Regions:
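Short, charged recognition helix plus adjacent turn
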Residues: 76-110
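General marker for long, soluble alpha-helical cores
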Residues: 1-3
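The alpha-helix within a helix-turn-helix
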Residues: 25, 36, 65
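DNA-binding alpha-helical recognition surfaces that contact promoter or target DNA
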Residues: 48, 62, 77
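A short, Lys/Arg-rich alpha-helix, primarily the initiator
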Residues: 5-30
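Short alpha-helical DNA-recognition segment
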Residues: 29-48
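Short, basic-rich loop-to-helix N-cap that marks the start of a DNA-contacting helix
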Residues: 53-66
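The DNA-recognition helices of helix-turn-helix-type DNA-binding domains
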Residues: 42, 53, 68, 79-82
């Protein structure tokens, strides 16, 4: 991984299911059903993640992190980036003002 590289903000981040489907699971030599069993989740749940129909929940991220040895944070951050990118394009925030950052974080004097 290249640190400090800027990604194109117009490109949707990869759904963790796509990474699992295209790279991670094939590299194990195991079937999707075997991976689901090892994770302790249903095949349907795993298939929904792989088809990008369901997000990787924190609970599943913990299981993935243990199984693949990379920790839950990788999967949680990947899902958060994907979800945030979509939310920023779907949510209408035009009626919400932007406060000066200092004012937003200062406590009022008492």
């Amino acid at each position: 991984m290249v640190y400090g590289a800027k990604r194109n903000p117009d490109r949707c981040p990869t759904h963790p299911g796509a990474l699992l489907r295209e790279d991670v699971i094939p590299a194990t030599g195991k079937t999707k059903a075997e991976i689901a069993q090892l994770l302790g989740i249903s095949r349907q749940h795993l298939y929904d993640i792989l088809r990008e129909r369901k997000p990787v929940s924190p609970a599943v991220a913990v299981r993935l992190g243990k199984l693949f040895g990379d920790g839950a944070g990788v999967w949680v951050r990947m899902q958060a980036a994907y979800d945030t990118w979509h939310a920023e394009r779907e949510e209408d925030v035009s009626g919400i003002p932007t406060l000066h950052p200092k004012a937003a974080y200062e406590r009022p004097e008492t």
